[in-house]
UniProtKB/Swiss-Prot annotation:
Subcellular location: Mitochondrion inner membrane
Similarity comment: Belongs to the protoporphyrinogen/coproporphyrinogen oxidase family. Protoporphyrinogen oxidase subfamily.
Biological processes annotated in GO: heme biosynthetic process; porphyrin-containing compound biosynthetic process; protoporphyrinogen IX biosynthetic process
Gene Ontology cellular component annotations, sorted alphabetically: mitochondrial inner membrane; mitochondrial membrane
GO molecular function, one term: oxygen-dependent protoporphyrinogen oxidase activity
Name used for this protein in its record: Protoporphyrinogen oxidase
Pfam families, A to Z: Amino_oxidase
Cofactor(s) needed: FAD
Record note on cofactor: Binds 1 FAD per subunit.
Name of the gene this protein is made from: PPOX
Primary location class: mitochondrion
EC nos: 1.3.3.4
Length: 477
């Protein structure tokens, strides 16, 4: 009888792990267990009354690098090439990004000319920050906060405006708490290897071999900055589910895991609400803190390391306006914490993907709310109503983009604990977990956003790596 692998969590990481397991030459029996009634995790697309697409989670995927190429290969393998909506390199959504500082939108400088001239909100040309960076000595600490790293290498303005905003946009987090080593490993490694971040990024870390396909070649030739799918990004997990079913993977929905226990013969017993499963190996693609509460007593040191990986909530407010126009064209803008503690940024969805505007077309923007404002609200225990978030989002759209009319359509979703926080020393938590798993030879593999990347590409790759680890070899078609 063959091995049984149980995958916990039907988000994109668990789906990717199941996909690669199912494509092995001699695949194990795969059981995917999801606590909710739907697959896809935070990737969710909703169609509005006029046919417009609203993304409640991620809204675009970057094609860059080996990870971006692997995701495009997955898209092709699933037969979704014709559904891809690219943002090409010459498009405003690829070229223009903004910061909202001092009550005004400021375009982030691009190209050499942009770096050589003063660009508000920065008081001096960013060229000088780059020059300063080249002369700075290498840091001596094994880890550092993003703010400390950026201030030391690039100066206080870049740290408090650009990097603060970036941490809010990517992690909905605080740059004074997040780890440079874990959140931006390429910057950390560039300094370690080349003493200078800029030098390291210019010289690169050596070419990583990446897959090849017609879609990957097209993305490179047209310099795509991101892409989506015609019916929304949820088409990707939906296609994965269809594929898994065709490959004989058992998909259990609405089955939250209640506990994990080790049997005498070294197999897992996975306890569900009304039943249980036996597994030779478990891949956990659920949040680290959730897994920590399911582990048996003999794995207490592992549970302690995992429970220390926390996550923050984000309120996503999708707004659509009829007959409205944006003051600028671009991907969107970020807001530093010094400007507004609650508004993380606004994405101009209609600029990047006008094909999803519906009929009649309406201007779509998404306001992200979070940060210390939301954390304080959550801690206070007061009711977090949809009206509260809608009002806050409409006020931000009015003040920051001049969208003063009432939206024709609005969706509000509070995603509780949706983005893991790689705080200072995160790498040590991962090391503790790895050492425990290796020392005790536990048939458990960790995957998902809690560990080494929160972007969709990172999650898909973590699922693939988990499958490779279980199979002991690269799966093939």
């Amino acid at each position: 009888m063959g091995r049984t692998v149980v995958v916990l969590g039907g988000g994109i990481s668990g789906l990717a792990a199941s996909y690669h397991l199912s494509r092995a030459p001699c695949p194990p029996k795969v059981v995917l267990v999801e606590g909710s009634e739907r697959l896809g995790g935070w990737i969710r697309s909703v169609r509005g009354p006029n046919g417009a697409i609203f993304e409640l989670g991620p809204r675009g995927i970057r094609p860059a690098g080996a990870l971006g190429a692997r995701t495009l290969l997955l898209v092709s393998e699933l037969g979704l090439d014709s559904e891809v909506l690219p943002v090409r390199g010459d498009h405003p959504a690829a070229q223009n990004r903004f910061l909202y500082v001092g009550g005004a939108l400021h375009a982030l400088p691009t190209g050499l000319r942009g770096l050589l001239r003063p660009s508000p909100p920065f008081s001096k040309p960013l060229f000088w920050a780059g020059l300063r960076e080249l002369t700075k000595p290498r840091g001596k600490e094994p880890d550092e906060t993003v703010h400390s790293f950026a201030q030391r290498r690039l100066g206080p303005e870049v740290a408090s405006l650009a990097m603060d905003s970036l941490c809010r946009g990517v992690f909905a987090g605080n740059s004074r708490e997040l780890s440079i080593r874990s959140c931006f490993p390429s910057l950390f490694q560039a300094e370690q290897t080349h003493r200078s971040v800029l030098l390291g990024l210019l010289l690169g870390a050596g070419r990583t071999p990446q897959p090849d396909s017609a879609l990957i070649r097209q993305a490179l030739a047209e310099r795509w900055s991101q892409w989506s799918l015609r019916g929304g990004l949820e088409m990707l997990p939906q296609a994965l589910e269809t594929h898994l079913t065709s490959r004989g993977v058992s998909v259990l929905r609405g089955q939250p895991v209640c506990g994990l226990s080790l049997q005498a013969e070294g197999r897992w017993k996975v306890s569900l609400r009304d039943s249980s499963l036996e597994a030779d190996h478990v891949i956990s693609a659920i949040p680290a803190s959730v897994l920590s509460e399911l582990l048996p007593a003999e794995a207490a040191p592992l549970a302690r390391a995992l429970s220390a990986i926390t996550a923050v909530s984000v309120a996503v407010v999708n707004l659509q306006y009829q007959g409205a126009h944006l003051p600028v064209q671009g991907f969107g803008h970020l807001v530093p914490s010094s400007e507004d503690p609650g508004v993380l940024g606004i994405v101009y969805d209609s600029v990047a993907f006008p094909e999803q505007d519906g009929s009649p077309p309406g201007l779509r923007v998404t306001v992200m709310l979070g940060g210390s404002w939301l954390q304080t609200l959550e801690a206070s225990g007061c009711v977090l109503s949809q009206e509260l978030f809608q009002q806050r989002a409409q006020e931000a759209a009015a003040a920051q983009l001049g969208l003063k009319e009432l939206p024709s359509h609005c969706l509000v979703h509070l995603h509780k604990n949706c983005i893991p926080q790689y705080t200072l020393g995160h790498w040590q938590k991962l090391e503790s977990a790895r050492q425990f798993l290796a020392a005790h030879r536990l048939p458990l593999t960790l995957a998902g956003a809690s560990y080494e990347g929160v972007a969709v590409n990172d999650c898909i790759e973590s699922g693939r790596q988990a499958a490779v680890s279980v199979l002991g070899t690269e799966p093939n078609g």
